[in-house]
Each structure stands twice: as structure tokens, then as C-alpha cells.
């Protein structure tokens, strides 16, 4: 079954996860999500497959997040998803998913759960 990977080629974990997929002959669609960010509905679908909330895939250490000075207790899930769509650098990476499930490739070995 083909999988999709939200990939950032500048991220070592993302590169390692993609390499694992290729090594195991997995047909994968690579989305350079910084250039082609997922829509709010796509993020919601991925979150459902991950069984996580938006704050759990949020990269709070990114400088742009700190500049927003947002309190996670005071922002709604929809607002957080919109923020990630507008600023995709805030989305944890890599995320590998298919029609049924998803994993975050941190550590890259998590990617093997998609095989």
C-alpha cells in the first residue's frame, strides 16, 4: 500500500525516514510540506490517524512560534490547525501516513510501523 510522507529534506530524521521507506521498497508519495502545506482538513485527517491533538504535533521550539506568543491553553484546535497551515514549519516532521494510519518518524524507526 502506498504511503505519503510530509518531508523536509533539510531534516535528518525526515531524510532517514524516507531512506527507510525506500530501503524496504515502499511506494511513497513525497510532499515537501513547507512548499505545499497541508490544508486544515488534511491536518485533521492526519491527526485522526495519529490519534493526537494539534498541540501534540506542534513544533513549539520554532522561533516563529515563540514570536506569536501564543498560549496553548487559550487557542482552539481549529485556530492551531490554521496556524500550522499558514506556518507549516510548525508541523512536526516527518509524518508518514496512508489511508488507515499515520506515524511521526521520530525516531525514524517509527516509520517501520507503516510497513
Predicted regions located by residue number:
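Thiol/selenol-based redox catalytic cores and closely related redox-interacting motifs
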Residues: 35-115
Amino acid at each position: 500500500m502506498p504511503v505519503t510522507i510530509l518531508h523536509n529534506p533539510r531534516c535528518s530524521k525526515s531524510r532517514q525516514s524516507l531512506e527507510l521507506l525506500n530501503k524496504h521498497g515502499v511506494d511513497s508519495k513525497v510532499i515537501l510540506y513547507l512548499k505545499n502545506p497541508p490544508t486544515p482538513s488534511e491536518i485533521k485527517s492526519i491527526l485522526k490517524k495519529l490519534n493526537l491533538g494539534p498541540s501534540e504535533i506542534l513544533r513549539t521550539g520554532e522561533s516563529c512560534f515563540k514570536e506569536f506568543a501564543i498560549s496553548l491553553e487559550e487557542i482552539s484546535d481549529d485556530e492551531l490547525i490554521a496556524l500550522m497551515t499558514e506556518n507549516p514549519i510548525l508541523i512536526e516532521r516527518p509524518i508518514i501516513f496512508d489511508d488507515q494510519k499515520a506515524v511521526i518518524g521520530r525516531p525514524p524507526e517509527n516509520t517501520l510501523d507503516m510497513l
